[in-house]
């Protein structure tokens, strides 16, 4: 027994010795330093190159641009990254000592191969890691100055930008390049790592693509106490890459359980925009997918263009979810949309009681509408909110007034002309400082103040 205990202790000691703390300070560091508190590295990309599985990287305040200002970071090792330190690492306050990833449009030509600002990709490793415990905490992602926005179209009074533009369209007056159109956090679909991936106390703002787009093979994904504000298509999306054993189409084998458990708790998800400025599809605050067991609890999910929570991806028998204790408000079409074959049901929070046991929903309790709008006073950008609530989309035909169309009209034939579309706003840049005010807006619900 004593020999076994000794061997166990030695193994634990070896594991501890292998895990290192690496310190990075953009202002005071140098890439030739050792990466200690006293001699930090200068750049995160350098720390990621030096790191080994199990290491923790500590980031001081600053705007980290990536190697050659590419503004993406390859995370191909099972590391943790903690931000929010003062430049001398004397204290850690993420909303005071901001560790930021805030690219500039002028560098979009350097964006390289990274699909996300953080691209988690283990596929080049000889063996992908098992049993990881990767933690990302106190980080701020903002693509508001990497995007390109129209100079005048879709620009409400008092806004500093017009509507978001998808490349190749761009604002040639202000910008050098089209929008970067990348994820903020991306995990490769071919990843086969197992274990736990956590993002806590982070902010995801102004993404021109899905903000948090993570595929995991087996284990846990945790997203807790984060703010998602003004992102395009989906705020948070988690998928499972492990194949599901089936006894028939959409019939998992008896005893099967989802391989990925996703905890999405105490997050605030506001202003998720549609794919295009016609406001026709996407615009989901949160989406669950096949092979995932999602726990959606105590979040504030509101002001999303299509729906707060999308449950239409994959058959209900192939996924599970509990949706409890959330605040849903002013999502434009519905608070939840789900598959009720062969249709899509769009349901408001006051109709949730009928959903339990449907489409993989195991529990849906204690959800409510926003009781006190005053909770967002001085925390939400009032101009942005008012413009969003007043937003209109119109489509009209400017007809040819010639005799040809006159005759077509008499005969009941289709008229010919040009279609013009107009939307009051679309994914305009949201001020980062206002997005960060959303931490702590409602006690117990949504993102809480970071301690």
Language model regions located:
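Hydrophobic h-region of N-terminal signal peptides that target proteins for export
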Residues: 10-18
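Right-handed parallel beta-helix/beta-solenoid
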Residues: 18-46, 63, 450-451
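The right-handed parallel beta-helix/beta-solenoid scaffold, focusing on the short coil/turn
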Residues: 20, 55, 71, 77-79, ...
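N-terminal extracellular ligand-recognition/capping segment immediately after the signal peptide
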Residues: 45-48, 53-91
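Short glycine/acidic-rich loop motifs that flank beta-strands on beta-rich extracellular proteins
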Residues: 68-70, 91, 105-106, 111-115, ...
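Right-handed parallel beta-helix/beta-spiral solenoid domain characteristic of secreted/periplasmic
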Residues: 79-162, 166-174
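Right-handed parallel beta-helix
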Residues: 83, 130-145, 160-174, 192-208, ...
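Acidic, glycine- and Ser/Thr-rich low-complexity intrinsically disordered tracts
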Residues: 90-108, 168, 316-451
